[in-house]
């Protein structure tokens, strides 16, 4: 399978629609790869993206498109969903009118992962019955709290409850299974998704507290998952401790990129290349492709997901 690096986001947004790099029945598109608030970041006046918008980043989101069925599925509705759907329309145009979304899968109720639902309402797209796949607590949160409850009442969205480790058929060629993971669960569960086609299994896991905690809860460690899966998009919020000035980062759970690479250092190059880092904070230097840290990730045999990337999941 071929993983094709996308063009710069600005170029993508103004370019004509691009055909898949190869004949591909099911294709994954990276629409954003940043942490919830993106970059430039609120309250961070020194971010270079203020002066150079090309250095900005949107919150993490992917789309999976079944080209045979003509169906598109969004994973995460971020605060940047307007720009991200425009990017998707450029890369894989919808067949009909409206947003062209046949379903939205949400991992958890933190702002960068669901706040974009607000644009589906009457003040924005005025969407009609978009299926939104969420875990039970998350479903109750959306149904019982405004403004999300208005989206449900007006049927801009239709809640589709999920169950842990129970696959749902998104389209004829795509099945999606939620896996619960440890994270701050103030308003909802937190899950990662395994996206299964007839040719591959892909893990989308932008947020979790600890690889060790997940392994203890699930009985499966990270290295085993790398062996069993074909592609993994995993939490890269921080590169290493010390990124946040004046903060004790031991109190901020997230696997560090350096730790994840070290954990998997004993795997073969063929296995390590399955892993792609996503959901990086504005302080994480891998957000810059030319940084020494990005070069280190590549040298260690891993990859960094970037907006505009595309990956064939079923040739």
Regions found by a protein language model. Name each.
Residues 74-78, 100-113, 117, 133-135, ...:
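Active-site neighborhood of phospho(di)ester-bond hydrolases with catalytic His/Asp-centered motifs
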Residues 199-201, 209-310:
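Cap/insert and terminal regions of metallo-dependent hydrolase folds
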Residues 14-16, 20:
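N-terminal signal peptide c-region/cleavage motif recognized by signal peptidases
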Residues 80-126:
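Di-metal (Zn2+ and/or Mg2+/Mn2+) metal-binding site signature of metallo-dependent hydrolases
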Residues 8-9, 19:
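Cleavable N-terminal signal peptides
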Residues 137-146:
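A short, active-site helix/loop in glycosyltransferases that binds the activated sugar's phosphate group
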Residues 1-7:
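Bacterial N-terminal signal peptides that target proteins for export
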Residues 22-90, 94-96, 159-225, 309-315:
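Core dinuclear metal-dependent hydrolase active-site scaffold
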């Amino acid at each position: 399978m071929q993983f094709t690096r996308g063009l710069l986001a600005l170029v993508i947004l103004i370019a004509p629609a691009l055909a898949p790099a190869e004949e591909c029945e099911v294709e994954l598109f990276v629409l954003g790869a940043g942490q919830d608030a993106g970059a430039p970041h609120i309250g961070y006046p020194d971010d270079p993206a203020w002066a150079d918008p090309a250095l900005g980043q949107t919150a993490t989101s992917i789309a999976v498109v079944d080209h045979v069925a003509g169906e598109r599925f969004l994973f995460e509705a971020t605060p940047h969903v307007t720009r991200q759907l425009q990017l998707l329309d450029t890369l894989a145009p919808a067949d009909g009118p409206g947003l062209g979304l046949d379903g939205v899968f949400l991992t958890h109720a933190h702002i960068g992962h669901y706040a974009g639902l607000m644009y589906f309402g009457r003040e924005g797209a005025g969407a009609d019955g978009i299926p939104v796949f969420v875990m039970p607590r998350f479903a109750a949160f959306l149904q019982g709290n405004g403004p999300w409850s208005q989206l449900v009442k007006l049927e801009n969205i239709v809640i589709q409850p999920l169950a842990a480790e129970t696959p749902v058929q998104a389209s004829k060629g795509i099945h999606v299974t939620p896996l619960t993971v440890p994270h701050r669960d103030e308003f909802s569960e937190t899950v990662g998704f395994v996206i299964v086609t007839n040719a591959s299994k892909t893990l989308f896991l932008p947020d979790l507290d600890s690889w060790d905690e997940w392994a203890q809860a699930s009985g499966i460690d990270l290295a085993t998952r790398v062996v069993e899966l074909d592609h993994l998009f995993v939490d890269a919020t921080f590169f290493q401790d010390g990124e946040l000035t004046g903060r004790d980062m031991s109190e901020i759970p997230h696997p560090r990129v350096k730790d994840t690479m070290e954990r998997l250092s004993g795997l073969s190059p063929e296995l390590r290349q399955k892993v792609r880092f996503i959901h990086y904070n504005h302080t994480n230097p891998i957000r810059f492709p030319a940084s020494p840290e990005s070069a280190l990730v590549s040298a260690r045999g891993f990859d960094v997901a970037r907006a505009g990337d595309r990956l064939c999941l079923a040739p």
